[in-house]
């Protein structure tokens, strides 16, 4: 069950780091994801900060789930973590494809968001494949 707990800790750490980044440097996140400087304003920064708080909520809930898992419920917990990574991944891959962009602001075909979405989908698959502890 150590493998499952380590994978859960990975999710917790990533969420905490992203949360700190979003709370304390929202403009940097926006520029990293290709937002033009003229669209980075206090409203956009506050929205990113809100998502930073949400990332901390994910980290805290993940920490709680990790501390309460047993051999009986570890598979269900890992499935929840896999589902969370799946949703993050689908958002990253499809968000730029579904939005209507003003002319000149269209994201590149293979942007940071798309790349991170693919990475998150891989995390989802890993979490799902390793959801059961090895039998003793």
Regions found by a protein language model. Name each.
Residues 16-17, 42-67, 83-87:
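Core segments of alpha-helical transmembrane spans in multipass integral membrane proteins
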Residues 1-17, 132:
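Cytosolic juxtamembrane helix and N-cap/initiation of the first transmembrane helix
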Residues 8, 72-81:
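Membrane-interfacial loop-to-transmembrane alpha-helix junctions, especially the N-terminal start
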Residues 90-112:
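Membrane-helix boundary connector in multi-pass membrane proteins
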Residues 77-95, 116-123:
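Hydrophobic alpha-helical membrane segments
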Residues 14-52:
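Hydrophobic transmembrane helix segments
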Residues 1-2, 66-75, 133-136:
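Membrane-interface helix-boundary motifs at transmembrane edges
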């Amino acid at each position: 069950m150590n493998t499952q707990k380590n994978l859960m800790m990975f999710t917790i750490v990533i969420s905490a780091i992203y949360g700190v980044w979003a709370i304390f440097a929202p403009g940097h996140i926006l520029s990293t994801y290709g937002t033009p400087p003229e669209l980075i304003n206090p409203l956009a920064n506050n929205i990113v900060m809100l998502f930073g708080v949400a990332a901390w909520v994910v980290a805290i809930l993940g920490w709680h789930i990790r501390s309460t898992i047993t051999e009986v419920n570890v598979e269900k917990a890992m499935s929840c973590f896999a589902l969370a990574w799946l949703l993050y991944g689908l958002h990253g891959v499809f968000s730029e494809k579904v939005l209507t962009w003003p002319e000149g602001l269209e994201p590149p075909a293979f942007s940071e968001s798309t790349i991170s979405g693919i990475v998150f989908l891989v995390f989802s698959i890993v979490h799902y494949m390793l959801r059961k502890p090895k039998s003793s």
